[in-house]
Amino acid sequence: MRNWRWLLLVLAALLSWLQHRFWFGPGNSGEVRMLQVQIVQQHQENERLRQRNASLAAEVKNLKDGDAAIEERARSELGMIKPGEIFYRVVEDIPTPLPNDTSADHGVDLAQPRREKR
């Protein structure tokens, strides 16, 4: 009977030590949960980067194979035009104030640039 008590005491001590390691020791349950969240976030980041790499690879292939992509980039980013082409710039007119516009009542001329006082 006395041996059973010692065995029970040793098993209870072992169980409490294992529980302590599970909850508070290295590799505890909170740390495992945190690592699982980081794994999910890393998978999402990897997928986003895969899509970006695919997009960049398609753009590189397009630039290597087709002149249209190079021409489009030269026009939009560098403002270049082809020889013999005429470039027209469309400038929007400044809207004229309507009769019921409140700025016209205060003598504000929208066509003239505003001068700041010094």
Swiss-Prot record:
Biased composition (Basic and acidic residues): 103-118
UniProt key word Cell inner membrane: yes
Pfam families the UniProt entry points to: DivIC (PF04977)
NCBIfam families given in the database record: PRK00888.1
GO CC, alphabetical: cell division site; cell septum; plasma membrane
Key words of the record: Cell cycle, Cell division, Cell inner membrane, Cell membrane, Coiled coil, Membrane, Transmembrane, Transmembrane helix
Origin superkingdom: Bacteria
Descriptive protein name: Cell division protein FtsB
Functional note: Essential cell division protein. May link together the upstream cell division proteins, which are predominantly cytoplasmic, with the downstream cell division proteins, which are predominantly periplasmic.
One GO term (biological process): FtsZ-dependent cytokinesis
